[in-house]
């Protein structure tokens, strides 16, 4: 009984860092999370596909492509996906094998590639370390020719998330200060807002940026 009690009361392992967390998660067979599946994924695809169609977007770059499930609903003429996880990238390459409109690379190999639209979906609030967040945001806007779409929470309230793989950020303020050539042109609230259960609601909304 003691060993059973001990197993159930061991302290949680310390957070290993953003990059290590996601590589370990995907390597162990984990996925991108509920936000990339089912009705959440359908809502996101509806908004993104409409934007691409309405603005005649021909090229898309995404930072944080994950396991590729969300991408399976996308209708992008040309797509380049980056991720920190080699395991996630391997899944994407296998899933979209033979699709010449899509390519995938490790974000460590980013070499200044640009696209008309740069995407960040369910990523910003998973960038726990300040330096990782800063590097990610600068890379995201550097890669965009005309549009940036961020799907994330926009708050600095992290009560209950300390020590986890989630860190909410007031990222719109960061953009105002650090990317003044870009302006928020539209915000799309989530069709399924968070009401206490992450399986049925999300704390992320869409934030659409364009060049001034």
Predicted regions and their residues:
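Class I (Rossmann-like) S-adenosyl-L-methionine-dependent methyltransferase catalytic domain
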Residues: 1-113, 130-212
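A conserved beta-strand element that flanks and buttresses the S-adenosyl-L-methionine
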Residues: 119
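Short catalytic micro-motifs in class I SAM-dependent methyltransferases
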Residues: 122-126
């Amino acid at each position: 009984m003691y060993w059973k009690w001990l197993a159930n009361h061991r302290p949680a392992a310390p957070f290993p860092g953003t990059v290590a967390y996601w590589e370990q998660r995907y390597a162990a067979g984990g996925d991108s999370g509920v936000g990339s599946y089912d009705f959440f994924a359908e809502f996101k695809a509806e908004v993104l596909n409409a934007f691409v169609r309405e603005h005649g977007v021909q090229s898309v770059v995404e930072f944080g492509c994950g396991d590729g499930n969300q991408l399976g609903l996308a209708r992008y003429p040309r797509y380049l996906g980056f991720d920190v996880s080699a395991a996630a990238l391997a899944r994407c390459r296998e899933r979209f094998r033979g699709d010449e409109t899509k390519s995938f690379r490790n974000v460590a190999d980013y070499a200044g590639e640009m696209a008309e639209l740069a995407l960040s979906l369910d990523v910003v609030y998973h960038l726990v370390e300040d330096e990782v967040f800063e590097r990610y945001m600068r890379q995201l806007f550097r890669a965009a020719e005309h549009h940036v779409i961020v799907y994330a929470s926009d708050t600095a309230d992290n009560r209950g998330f300390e020590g986890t793989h989630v860190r909410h950020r007031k990222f719109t303020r960061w953009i105002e200060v650090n990317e003044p050539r870009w302006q928020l042109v539209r915000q799309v609230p989530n069709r399924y807002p968070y009401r206490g259960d992450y399986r049925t609601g999300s704390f992320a909304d869409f934030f659409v940026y364009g060049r001034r």
